[in-house]
Each structure stands twice: as structure tokens, then as C-alpha cells.
Amino acid sequence: MNLIMTILTITVALSLILATVSFWLPQMNPDAEKLSPYECGFDPLGSARLPFSLRFFLVAILFLLFDLEIALLLPLPWGDQLHNPTGTFFWATTVLILLTLGLIYEWTQGGLEWAE
């Protein structure tokens, strides 16, 4: 219990110190030079901020979601060595069903079609 209180005290103190120091640090003042893109000393030819495809962002988020799902289900073969493997497999199946329903919903809403 004493170790937990020590760690908790250090964590709270460090958080308060860092929050206080962040207010004292100089604020960033953006100007035209700081906001302009750097092109090896040449004047910029165009805008450095290109438009980002919202479809690409949606597909990337879906990829990360399903990649995380696979990473969470990788230790599942060792689930039969637990005291209650039925509960583990039940929750894994529930997660798979929910994510499959989400994928079907995205598919029917046209979220996976690339053409605009």
C-alpha cells in the first residue's frame, strides 16, 4: 500500500509540475515565415497543404479497427487453457459479430466504395 501511495504521489506531483511549466513557457507566435513551406530556399510554387481525401481517411480508420481486432484475437488459441474457456470464446464471438455487423453496415452505406 505504501508503494502505491508513493507512485500515486509522484505521478500527481509530476503532472502538476508539467502543467505549471507549460503555462510559463513562451507561447508560439506564428507569422508568415513560420507558416510558409520550406523548399530549399526557393519561393514556394504552390500550397503545401494538399486536400486530403475523406474516403481514404475512412478506409484507413476501418483498416486500423480491423487490424486491432485481429491483434486482440491472436491470443485466442490459448483461451482453451483457462478455467472458463466458454466465456472467453463467447466474448470473442460477440466482438467478431459486432465488428462484422459494423462492416456490413459500412458496406451497405457505401463507405467502402472509392469512386466519388
Swiss-Prot record:
Assigned EC number = 7.1.1.2
Keyword entries, A-Z: Electron transport, Membrane, Mitochondrion, NAD, Respiratory chain, Translocase, Transmembrane, Transmembrane helix, Transport, Ubiquinone
List the catalysed reactions. Answer: a ubiquinone + NADH + 5 H(+)(in) = a ubiquinol + NAD(+) + 4 H(+)(out)
Q: Which Pfam families match?
A: Oxidored_q4
Cellular component per GO, a single term: mitochondrial membrane
Q: Which molecular function terms from Gene Ontology are attached?
A: NADH dehydrogenase (ubiquinone) activity
Which stretches are transmembrane? 3-23, 56-76, 87-107
Major localisation: mitochondrion
Q: Where in the cell is it found?
A: Mitochondrion membrane
Highest taxon of the lineage: Eukaryota
Q: How does it sit in the membrane?
A: Multi-pass membrane protein
Task: Explain the purpose of this protein.
Answer: Core subunit of the mitochondrial membrane respiratory chain NADH dehydrogenase (Complex I) that is believed to belong to the minimal assembly required for catalysis. Complex I functions in the transfer of electrons from NADH to the respiratory chain. The immediate electron acceptor for the enzyme is believed to be ubiquinone.
The family classification in the record reads: Belongs to the complex I subunit 3 family.
* Name listed for the protein in its UniProt record: NADH-ubiquinone oxidoreductase chain 3
UniProt organism field: Cyprinus carpio (Common carp)
